[in-house]
């Protein structure tokens, strides 16, 4: 699986190289996908400067807004919400920017003390017990 991951990541780097070198940001919505570029890419491909650049130029939407557009404004919702933080986001990325965005939304939020469902990444697609639950 790691050999395939390296091959696919090298293909992505080749395709995105002009944008990476131009400093373009990649904004993702799904923490497991973002963590591939931010964490796994630089651990699997250690000899490519563009891999390091892509890692540094990849953001979750809330990170991008908080870091690159700190004065962004959004309509206030004024309601209660429950927040289930994605386990990849909490363990590999960060969750602070979600809180910043929730505050800007004007919501009364409660972050649930919840665990990992185990379905993100390749875990949910491995043959056996995981696969049947994920599909």
Where are these regions (language model features)?
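Iron-sulfur cluster-binding electron-transfer modules in prokaryotic oxidoreductases
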Residues: 1-135
């Amino acid at each position: 699986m790691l050999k395939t991951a390296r091959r696919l990541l090298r293909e992505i780097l080749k395709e995105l190289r002009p944008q990476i070198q131009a400093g373009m940001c990649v904004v993702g919505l799904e923490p497991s996908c973002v963590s591939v570029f931010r964490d796994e890419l630089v651990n699997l491909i250690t000899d490519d400067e563009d891999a390091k650049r892509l890692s540094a130029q990849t953001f979750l939407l809330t990170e991008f807004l908080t870091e690159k557009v700190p004065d962004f404004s959004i309509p206030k919702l004024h309601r209660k919400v429950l927040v289930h933080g994605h386990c990849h986001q909490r363990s590999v990325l960060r969750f602070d920017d979600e809180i910043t965005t929730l505050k800007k939304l004007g919501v009364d939020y409660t972050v649930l003390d919840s665990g990992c469902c185990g379905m993100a990444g390749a875990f949910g697609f491995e043959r056996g017990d995981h696969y049947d639950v994920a599909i």
